[in-house]
Amino acid sequence: MKLILLLCFISITNYSFAQKIFHQQKAKGKWQYIYPFVDKSYILAIQHLIIERKPFAEIYNANIYFGKSEPKANKIFWKENIDMRQITHNITYEDYNNDGIKDLLIFEDTGARGGNSFYNLYLVNPKNHTLTKVKDFDKIVNPSYNKKHKVIVSYGLTGTNYYQLYRFGKKYKPYEIGKPFDDTDNLDLDKKIAAILKITKTTEQKNKQLTHQ
C-alpha cells in the first residue's frame, strides 16, 4: 500500500513540474518570447492577457517565465506575475551594472503626462545563463545609465522636470544619491553629477571617521 502511495506521489509530482510552458498551441493569452542568450533554449516568456481585458482597461495582468526549453518538458527557473501595459516595442537592452553586458528591460507602465516610463530590469549573466531581477527598479522614472559616472540617471516629467541619481547597493537594490535637482536652461548635467558624487563621497568619508572614533 505504501509503495502504491509513493508511486502515485511521484507521478503527481512529475506532472506538476514536468510541463511544457513554452510554445503551447492552445495556451491561454498572448505569448511573447525573448531569447537573452546565444543558446536559444533559454527563454524569457511573457504570457499577456491571461485574464480577459475589461473595456477601456489600459493595465492588465501578465505572467513572466524564465526557463529552459527541452524536448519533453521545460525547466522553469522562476516565474512572476505583474501588472503591465501592453505596447509593441516593450523590450530594450542597456548595460546597468557596468559589466559590458547589455541588460534586459521590460516596459511596465507610463505615469503622469504620458512621458514618464517605468521598467523592470533584469541583469543578464551569459556565463551562468541567469536573469536577475532588480528589486524596486520599476519605481525609477525614465531611467538611463551614465557610464562615465557609473550612476543611474532618472528624469521625471512633472510641473518642473527634474533629475535624480541612483546607484546599486547590496543585492543590486537601487538607492538615491543626493537630492533631486531641476532641469534648467543653464544646467550642465555632467558637472552637476560630478558635484553631487563629490559631496556624497566626502560625506561618506566623514561618517566612516565618526564611526571609528
PLM region descriptions:
Residues 11-13:
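N-terminal signal peptide c-region/cleavage motif recognized by signal peptidases
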Residues 99:
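Acidic carboxylate motifs that coordinate Ca2+ or other divalent cations, activating on Asp/Glu
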